[in-house]
């Protein structure tokens, strides 16, 4: 499995509606997106977050990623990696991708409540300033 495989499957989910705790093509949230991508790639299930609230004051998402993925430096992120954003009490997860509209930039694919669907956008400095962890699936070679 490669980072390009992760991006390909994630892009196939663009437009899927946002559904809190969703884990299927019928609806996804930000955690459900990488969970479903892993499932569609035939990778072991890493979903250990059932029953979570929309907001949290703890670092469960970050701790879970550290325990189950390989942490990478922000300067080393590449398509297929997972970003964990912590902004106030909000927690968010996104998949890094290439960004065809701006070839020298990276983008993110994420299930985002404000857009009510899985969407793709450019990865900008404002988002990166709130990123608290960058991770790679263990099954992906560096």
Please provide the spans of the model-predicted regions:
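...with weaker cross-activation on analogous glycine-rich loops/strands in unrelated enzymes
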Residues: 2-7, 48-117, 123
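Active-site nucleophilic cysteine motif
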Residues: 21-41
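Bacterial peptidoglycan biogenesis and beta-lactam-recognition machinery
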Residues: 39-46, 101
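Short, solvent-exposed coil/turn elements at secondary-structure transition points
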Residues: 24, 114, 137-140
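Non-catalytic ligand/cofactor/substrate-binding and regulatory segments of enzyme domains
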Residues: 1-16, 120-142
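Surface-exposed patches in mature extracellular/periplasmic domains of secreted proteins
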Residues: 19-23, 45-50
């Amino acid at each position: 499995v490669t980072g390009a495989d992760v991006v390909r499957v994630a892009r196939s989910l663009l437009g899927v509606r946002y559904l809190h705790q969703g884990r299927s093509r019928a609806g996804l949230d930000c955690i459900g997106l990488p969970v479903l991508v892993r499932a569609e790639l035939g990778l072991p299930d890493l979903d250990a977050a059932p029953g979570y609230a929309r907001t949290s004051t703890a670092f469960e998402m970050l701790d879970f990623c550290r325990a189950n993925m390989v942490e990478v430096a922000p300067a080393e992120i590449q398509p297929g990696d997972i970003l964990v954003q912590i902004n106030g009490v909000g927690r968010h997860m996104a998949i890094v991708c290439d960004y065809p509209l701006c070839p020298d930039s990276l983008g993110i694919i994420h299930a985002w409540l404000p857009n009510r669907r899985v969407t793709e956008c450019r990865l900008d400095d404002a988002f990166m300033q709130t990123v608290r962890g960058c991770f790679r699936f263990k099954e992906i070679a560096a």
